């Protein structure tokens, strides 16, 4: 499932993050690449664990913790600290798949990358190109979202970023280990939760159907969760 999550950051929060990022020193994006990705990747990136990356990343993690749609769709167990990249002057990222396990340098913290996330930090009209293209059995899905919006998709997907030919595309990217490993199971739970929320709004939380469906949701989560 590929999902657009609007308004993860407010415009004010985006501006605060950009103030941090625009004052930072950027390095070659291949610092975090695997062997396959290094052959396809050309961009700039904030050094992992740098003060700027930590400050902006903390703001994003705080926002994610308050976002009900993110929790419903991802069922997060672990979130890799957000990283940041910048594409300009023809930079692009060819077709690749993300590494299955992400290690936080200098620690024993590791994340199984069930889901990948890109949080856009530049308005789409300010640059040409830079579309995130995610492939699945139904074709290629493209994302170029307003600043503050995020796209969530299975980390097992082939994906690429088209060349940026004008302006600069600035974004955060990170990975999530879900409590529910299987994408189909996780999608089913998300769809069920969405309908429970809709039914609750119509009938109230004490309705017998709402109570029954909520029980089914939690029993499925109990069956499938790794937590």
Swiss-Prot record:
GO terms classed as biological process: DNA damage response; intracellular iron ion homeostasis
Residues binding 2-oxoglutarate: 169
Domain (Fe2OG dioxygenase) ranges: 78-178
Broad enzyme group: oxidoreductase
Cited SUPFAM superfamilies: Clavaminate synthase-like
Keywords for this protein: Dioxygenase, Iron, Metal-binding, Oxidoreductase, Vitamin C
Cofactor note: Binds 1 Fe(2+) ion per subunit.
Full protein name: PKHD-type hydroxylase BURPS668_A1690
Domain of life of the source: Bacteria
Stored PANTHER family: PKHD-TYPE HYDROXYLASE YBIX (PTHR41536:SF1)
Positions that bind Fe cation: 96, 98, 159
Pfam family, one: 2OG-FeII_Oxy_3
Entry's Gene Ontology molecular function annotations: 2-oxoglutarate-dependent dioxygenase activity; iron ion binding; L-ascorbic acid binding
Coiled coil: none
PROSITE patterns: FE2OG_OXY (PS51471)
């Amino acid at each position: 499932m590929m999902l657009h999550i609007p308004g993860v950051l407010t415009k004010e929060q985006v501006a605060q993050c950009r103030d941090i990022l625009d004052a930072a020193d950027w390095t070659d994006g291949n610092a975090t690449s695997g062997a396959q990705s290094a052959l396809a990747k050309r961009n700039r990136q904030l050094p992992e664990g740098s003060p700027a990356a930590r400050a902006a990343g903390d703001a994003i993690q705080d926002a994610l913790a308050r976002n009900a749609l993110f929790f419903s769709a991802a069922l997060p167990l672990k979130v890799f600290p957000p990283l940041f990249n910048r594409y300009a002057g023809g930079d692009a990222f060819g077709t690749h798949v993300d590494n299955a396990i992400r290690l936080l340098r200098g620690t024993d913290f590791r994340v199984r990358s069930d889901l990948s996330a890109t949080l856009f930090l530049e308005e789409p009209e300010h640059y040409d190109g830079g579309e995130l293209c995610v492939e699945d059995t139904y074709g290629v899905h493209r994302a170029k979202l307003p600043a503050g919006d995020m796209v969530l998709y299975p980390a097992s997907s082939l994906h690429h970023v088209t060349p940026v030919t004008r302006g600069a595309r600035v974004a955060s990217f990170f990975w999530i280990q879900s409590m529910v490993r299987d994408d189909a199971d996780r999608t089913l739970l998300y769809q069920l939760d969405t309908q429970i929320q809709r039914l609750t709004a119509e009938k109230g939380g004490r309705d017998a159907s709402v109570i029954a469906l909520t029980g089914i949701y939690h029993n499925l989560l109990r069956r499938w969760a790794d937590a």
